[in-house]
Structures are given as structure tokens and as C-alpha cells.
Design a protein with these regions (language model features):
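Short beta-strand/loop motif that positions the catalytic acidic residue
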Residues: 93, 99-101, 105
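Serine-hydrolase catalytic machinery in alpha/beta-hydrolase-like enzymes
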Residues: 1-42, 140-154
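Alpha/beta-hydrolase-fold catalytic nucleophile elbow
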Residues: 5, 51-53, 79-82, 100, ...
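Short alpha-helix in the alpha/beta-hydrolase fold that links the catalytic acid
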Residues: 95, 109-119
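Primarily recognizes the serine-hydrolase "nucleophile elbow" in alpha/beta-hydrolase
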Residues: 24-94
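C-terminal catalytic histidine-bearing segment of alpha/beta-hydrolase fold enzymes
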Residues: 125-177
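Acidic catalytic loop of the alpha/beta-hydrolase fold
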Residues: 104-108, 136
């Protein structure tokens, strides 16, 4: 497992209120990390999956749009938890993607992603799930169910977390060699 630390590499401690960050730039970091992993002898290169949360979720989706058509993808799949899609552009790739969103998300509203997803070409391998009572951070068990994050509300939702965990497990098991 590798975590792409897109904050400290840019001298930042968080992504809140930073116009210096966008999903496309971080998507390039994701692809660079995946390409690096492909060259490591201890890595099964055909099994590299990128998983991201919030801005990182938008980044793993943005990485799909940066894959050259003639190049084999270093990613077998991507999973995006409550992705931040404001900067996201439609992509065209065969790499399967799973997007898990909360209908009550005020930080990364699912409607923004849905507009992008509606522009994807037919045959794009995307599964999008929206959990009705879930907010941003629905899988973070350390959060209360209702917490302020700046002016937005975030919170843990046990039912959405359990459903998303099952969804991810099923999604990834279908992608195994």
C-alpha cells in the first residue's frame, strides 16, 4: 500500500481553502505512483488499484482522464469515496471505476459528479452509488454523525459505511485475476 501525500509535497497541511490544489494535478501524482509501483519486483503490476477520499477521490477519477490511449494503464481499477468533482473532466478509458457518494454531502455534492458522469462516453466502466442519508466522511468512524467542517456538515453513517464496504469488496473481487 502506498499513500500519495499530495499535501506536504506542496508545503501544505490541509486542502481546505487552498486554490493551489486541483484533482488533475493530484491525478498526475497518482499515475506517477502507480507507474513507480509497476516497476517494483514485489508488486503484482496488474493489481494496482487507486483509492481516494474527497479531493483524493476526485484525483483518482481525474487520473483516468490522463491515461494516454496508446499506453497500457498502470491501474486495474479506481475507487473514489465522496469525490470532489468540481475540477473533474469526463474521461474515456476501460479502467473500471467505483464512486461512493453521500446524498447529504455538502463538501462534495454528488450532483457535481453526476453532471460529469452524464458526459462520459457510452461503455465507460463506472459504477456510482449514492447513499441517501450519508454525508461527507460517512466512513470515518471517529466522526460523530453530525459535525461542522467549516460551514459544511460532515459525519459518520454506519449503514452507509457498511454498504460501501460491501460494494468495494464486491467491486474489487470482480477485478481480480
Amino acid at each position: 500500500m502506498v499513500f500519495v501525500d499530495y499535501l506536504s509535497a506542496r508545503g501544505l497541511t490541509n486542502c481546505r481553502g487552498s486554490g493551489a490544489l486541483n484533482a488533475a494535478e493530484i491525478g498526475r501524482d497518482v499515475l506517477a505512483a502507480a507507474r513507480y509501483l509497476q516497476g517494483q519486483p514485489y508488486v503484482k503490476a496488474s493489481q494496482i488499484t487507486a483509492v481516494g477520499w474527497s479531493l483524493g477521490g476526485g484525483a483518482v477519477l481525474a487520473a483516468l482522464g490522463q491515461l494516454p490511449a496508446a499506453e497500457a494503464s498502470p491501474l486495474r481499477a479506481v475507487v473514489a469515496y465522496y469525490p470532489y468533482c468540481r475540477d473533474l473532466q469526463p474521461w474515456q478509458t476501460k479502467v473500471p471505476a467505483l464512486s461512493l457518494m453521500g446524498a447529504q454531502d455538502e463538501v462534495a455534492p454528488p450532483e457535481v459528479c453526476q453532471r460529469v458522469f452524464a458526459q462520459l462516453p457510452p461503455g465507460t466502466a463506472l459504477q456510482a452509488r449514492i447513499y441517501p442519508e450519508a454525508r461527507h466522511g460517512f466512513d470515518v468512524s471517529d466522526l460523530p454523525s453530525y459535525a461542522k467542517f467549516g460551514s459544511e456538515i460532515v459525519g459518520y453513517n454506519a449503514a452507509a459505511y457498511a454498504a460501501a464496504a460491501r460494494e468495494v469488496e464486491q467491486f474489487l473481487s470482480r477485478k481480480s485475476d
